[in-house]
Amino acid sequence: MQTIAVIGGGITGVTTAYALVQRGFAVTLFEQHRYAAMETSFANGGQLSASNAEVWNHTSTVLKGLKWMLRSDAPLLVNPTPTWHKLSWMAEFLAAIPKYEANTVATARLAISARQHLFAWAQAEGIDFDLKRQGILHIYRDKAGFDHAARVSRLLAEGGLPRRAVTPDEMRAIEPTLAGSYYGGFFTESDSTGDIH
């Protein structure tokens, strides 16, 4: 029997190890933390979502990234010190920009499939992880953000993911604790949440 090492005990590592065991491999899972799923899998808020499938390879991301380099609280930080690995990664990132639409559609299809696998595995193994199939609401404070989300929604729909535009009143009906002023939102009913631990 072949033995495979999987490095990282987040959702990707654990599900990869599970799939390999199902195929007859012996698997050893290595995790640097005391508990599994303490980094990215924990930070995503327990989302089992396909509605975040928009790829980052877009001109606007590059422009935002340049602005963010001047902020200490940026959502994405890139150390500007050049290295061969970093420069080649950036070149590949930029080269993928013309494929933004096709890649977003393909990523939506992949995300839907991954979500279905997770649901099936949890059911087959009897895993209770506080699954809530209540959808995920994305909110936008201005027309520009909402209009961009509408364009993304068309790509997600092409990938098989329905999501609908909602008004501020509809947003408050979906999420009664929502406060503040918003332009609108998009609600993906098929998205879910669960407890990664």
Task: Map each language-model feature to its residues.
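Short glycine-/acidic-enriched loop or helix-start segments at secondary-structure transitions
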Residues: 16, 39-40, 59-60
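N-terminal Rossmann-like FAD-binding beta1-loop-alpha1 element of flavoenzymes
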Residues: 2-29
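Accessory recognition modules or surfaces
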Residues: 1-7, 11-12, 36-50
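Rossmann-like flavin
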Residues: 86-197
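Glycine-rich FAD pyrophosphate-binding loop
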Residues: 22-42
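Glycine-rich active-site loop/strand segments that organize a redox cofactor
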Residues: 43-109, 129
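Hydrophobic/aromatic beta-strand patches that form the interior of the parallel beta-sheet core
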Residues: 28-30, 48, 137, 164
